[in-house]
Regions:
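Conserved active-site motif detector
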Residues: 1-97
């Protein structure tokens, strides 16, 4: 299995204070819509629900991490992921495909 990194963004829009922790388990859920058919929602099942999205812009993704557009065809409708690094705004996470 290959480990792919992606940037989690939008967490600050869902919560006033950061809830992200290294090692936190996440679920990726494909949520295409008419504005962005490559939308991938990031969910925590520990009572928090949606905490953000996979970055889909060169302006929001960090380093060499995958954008939602590159990742969407590599995962099922739901996929497990984990936070690797917590940043000021968001996190770098990994998913095994």
């Amino acid at each position: 299995m290959e480990k792919i990194y992606f940037t989690l963004v939008g967490e600050h829009l869902c919560f006033e204070h950061s809830v992200l922790e290294k090692g936190m388990e996440l679920t990726l859920v494909k949520k295409p819509n008419e504005l962005d058919p490559e939308t991938i929602e990031v969910v925590v099942s520990e009572g928090l629900g949606k905490i953000g999205y996979v970055a889909n812009s060169v302006y929001t993704r960090k380093g060499t991490s995958y954008s939602a557009g590159r990742l969407i065809d590599k995962i099922e409708d739901n996929a497990s992921a984990v936070i690797e690094y917590v940043l000021d705004r968001g996190a770098i996470c990994s998913v095994c495909v």
